[in-house]
Amino acid sequence: MKEMAGTLVRGICGQVEGSVIPGMLGMEAGQSAFGDVYAWFKQLLMWPLVDSRLAGGSEHDALVDGISDRLMDRLMVEAGERPVGSSRVLALDWLNGRRTPDADQKLRGAIIGLSLGVDAPDIFKSLVEATAFGAKAIAERFMLEGVPVKEVIALGGVPRKAPYITQTLADVLGIPVKVAASEQTCALGAAMFAATAGGIYVDVSKAQQAMGCGFDMEFRPRPENSKRYVELYELYHRLSGFMESMKER
């Protein structure tokens, strides 16, 4: 907390001394939608099958489940093979409003640059990039307020199941993204605090050293992609400003 003395980060959701670990400062920030953005797009593509009035029964349900399971994998493969900026499609990730920085739930998302040559993987790629740009906007706010962001630790389903998305995040942020090895990080963290409170370890740091599982994946930014994403991020900011100006219309 000494490094943060007198610093109050504007536009985040919370900043409390000792809220996470005693003697340290906890700062809360996040996006209103990340994985939900991909789920929304998947639902759009699946709608003709899921909502079909012409089919039903176990065979139809099995077909829907099979396509649903493979759809996202196929989208990620196709999107990952396409160069950054190749489609000129740009998206804004405010499909559920904006949480950080500067919360405003009245804001809405956008997709621009569409043409008859754009396909589903192009749009999906733009949505993945948009969620990464949203994360960069948060990191940028911290850095502008004097809080360095040197690396990101990712946990949960998306980082483990979707390496394309996590690699894009590293490319956009320009810093390494480590993926926690544990699939139950929240439960593991609770167990660490319980072990400390029960006197098994003298502090949370010791519990982390003894009980932590470390990381099993690390994604490092690819210089060429990162350079291109700097340019696209500026366009993302311009689109953000336009959508903010349209909020009340």
What role is predicted for each listed range?
Residues 2-249:
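Glycine/Thr-rich phosphate-binding loops that ligate phosphate moieties of nucleotide
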